[in-house]
Amino acid sequence: MNLLKEVLKNQVYPAMGCTEPVSVALCAAYAAKELGKPVQKAVFYLDAGTFKNGLAVRIPNTSGERGNLLAGTAGLLIAKPQLKMEILKAATPSILKRAKQLIDDKKAFIKVAPCKKHFYIKVEVENGKDKASCVISDSHTTVSKLTKNGKVIFENKPSKKKEDNYKQLLGKATLKDLIALADNADNTDLKYIKKGVEMNLNACKEGKKLKKVGFFLESTVEKSILQKNLVTETKIMAARVADARMDGIAVPVMSSGESGNQGVVAILVPYNVGKKSKVKEEKILKSIAFSHLLNGYVKVYTGSLSPLCGCAIAAGVGAAGAIVYQQNGDLKKITLAINNIISDIGGMLCDGAKSGCALKVVSSVDSAIRAAYMGLNNYGITELEGFIGKTAEETIQNLGNISITGMCDVDAVIVDIMKKKVK
């Protein structure tokens, strides 16, 4: 098994809109297609993280509407699971009208699934006596179970062979292993990674049309509040893409770690830094491969959806490591960079996907570039301080322990606050 290829296949793909509500729509589409009749009633069971991430974010092709429920109900009516994470490009005014009618008639509603620690979506649909259901779990596109009228149509049981689970292997990899994987990325890998760069640059153009975080950040440069330099330029670029995604603009973005905003940071930061530093294209693309691997590695420990902000922390770790990698920094310097960024923004909370994510993206970009150049100059936070470990791997594992073990109540409190906002 080639871990890089597995990460690219499972975690790096085009997504239109915030990935959690899109995954809800995808799950609904599978259930509706299996039912084979117009859906008269639907119940959406979501893990707390998916509920949180889809509550306030705008949905593509809905004229600015928000939320998992509308996305999922639209997915029921589209019923084209073959569209995968671009399913909402098929949302039409007619579909939205029918979706809103189902919601208004109390025929479609959401429940937060209890005690689900990992990514989990279940959609149950009905038409008279006929029923169907779909479960997507562990990743945004992995169908784990499909049923119709009580009969299991499909079930994806986890393999008992550890070598079949790329995430387990990724979690056991060392930083040295990940560097070697990036070094040996082949032309197919690099071509796909370049496609992601181009896709995200195109999304940046769409974000430029909005008067949001990227716009106001650029205005501070025009007013000489901030200097025009590599760091500021990269922050503006990344903010524009996040602005576009969170505003529901119907433009695809290449994800990383199964997240579009993480793809913004993990891809565009090493791309722009490398380009401005006149690094050869092949090296830049390999550094982005390393960024994807690092992002995926962090999320093995912190969880797919976490109380911690993934687009800032996990993707920021990937970006910081990638910058050092493309500057031919050694293992020690990459370790210092990773320790620096985790020490800086390792406690940033996730309170769901929304326009404010662009602010966190900007903070991540700033921290990643600073952390990388400090590491390149042999400066970094050591294991004598806080939760920083002796190695980058240990630091990331400590962060994961804080996220999974130490912050369960934090996530519950955030979700409880957000539930009160649902009318």
Swiss-Prot record:
Record GO terms (molecular function): L-cysteine desulfhydrase activity
Pfam families: SDH_alpha
BP terms from Gene Ontology: L-cysteine catabolic process to pyruvate
UniProt-listed InterPro entries: Ser_deHydtase-like_asu, UPF0597
HAMAP family, sorted: UPF0597
Family assignment from sequence similarity: Belongs to the UPF0597 family.
UniProt xrefs under PANTHER family: UPF0597 PROTEIN YHAM
Name the UniProt record assigns to this protein: UPF0597 protein Emin_0811
Organism annotation: Elusimicrobium minutum (strain Pei191)
